[in-house]
Amino acid sequence: MATPGFPSTEQRLGLYPVVDSLLWIERLLAAGVTTLQLRIKNADDAQVEQDIVAAIELGKRYQARLFINDYWQLAVKHGAYGVHLGQEDLEAADLAAIQQAGLRLGISTHDEHELAVAKTLRPSYIALGHIFPTQTKQMPSSPQGLASLSRQVKNTPDYPTVAIGGISIERVPHVLATGVGSVAVVSAITLASDWQRATAQLLHLIEGKELADEK
């Protein structure tokens, strides 16, 4: 049985960093990022809950859209803004409980079939990926490319869309040209030689925020 639909979010979420630590959440909120995701891997349960609680508090303090990856029970328990789930997590998660708690839901998709499945669940946004090759995580699927992204965006007018996977600063203009509403990045910020500068450039490209004058 389909869920009755999840709370809506902005049609264009803008820059959407996906990070793995509370430190990065703090840094990026202070840098002006308003949509972000905490994706914790390989941590013990007590530390995970502690970090999620702290991240949710920070998100509320900055009035940001903070999504918790995977740990939907903790997100519900502590009143997160939203949850992000991969396709492999959908069957195990209690989607009705997430919806009844008033949390937003984002869902990952990797092809047309998964996109169709996501639409039946009426989430708050749909992530489309991976667009380019990525070293951030092992992917069983092949990169979709810009042509596929453009087609999927056009076929998904009723949902905010997020492009993810191997998106560098240089690739952002081409990704935005597809009409996608948000661009998720990982290593473009976390592996940058100057993460603050990289974040400012991405905010400028994606959201039109002014860059500080060069000295």
Curated annotation (Swiss-Prot):
The keyword Magnesium applies. GO terms for biological process: thiamine biosynthetic process; thiamine diphosphate biosynthetic process. It comes from Yersinia pestis. InterPro entries: Aldolase_TIM, ThiamineP_synth_sf, ThiamineP_synth_TenI, TMP_synthase. Mg(2+) binds at residues 70, 89. 2-[(2R,5Z)-2-carboxy-4-methylthiazol-5(2H)-ylidene]ethyl phosphate binds at residues 134-136, 166, 186-187. This is Thiamine-phosphate synthase. It catalyses: 2-[(2R,5Z)-2-carboxy-4-methylthiazol-5(2H)-ylidene]ethyl phosphate + 4-amino-2-methyl-5-(diphosphooxymethyl)pyrimidine + 2 H(+) = thiamine phosphate + CO2 + diphosphate; 2-(2-carboxy-4-methylthiazol-5-yl)ethyl phosphate + 4-amino-2-methyl-5-(diphosphooxymethyl)pyrimidine + 2 H(+) = thiamine phosphate + CO2 + diphosphate; 4-methyl-5-(2-phosphooxyethyl)-thiazole + 4-amino-2-methyl-5-(diphosphooxymethyl)pyrimidine + H(+) = thiamine phosphate + diphosphate. Pathway: Cofactor biosynthesis; thiamine diphosphate biosynthesis; thiamine phosphate from 4-amino-2-methyl-5-diphosphomethylpyrimidine and 4-methyl-5-(2-phosphoethyl)-thiazole: step 1/1. Condenses 4-methyl-5-(beta-hydroxyethyl)thiazole monophosphate (THZ-P) and 2-methyl-4-amino-5-hydroxymethyl pyrimidine pyrophosphate (HMP-PP) to form thiamine monophosphate (TMP). Belongs to the thiamine-phosphate synthase family. HAMAP family: TMP_synthase. Binds 1 Mg(2+) ion per subunit. GO terms for molecular function: magnesium ion binding; thiamine-phosphate diphosphorylase activity. Its EC number is 2.5.1.3. GO terms for cellular component: cytoplasm. 4-amino-2-methyl-5-(diphosphooxymethyl)pyrimidine binds at residues 37-41, 69, 108, 137. The gene is thiE. It holds the Pfam family TMP-TENI. Its cofactor is Mg(2+). SUPFAM superfamilies: Thiamin phosphate synthase. Keywords: Magnesium, Metal-binding, Thiamine biosynthesis, Transferase.
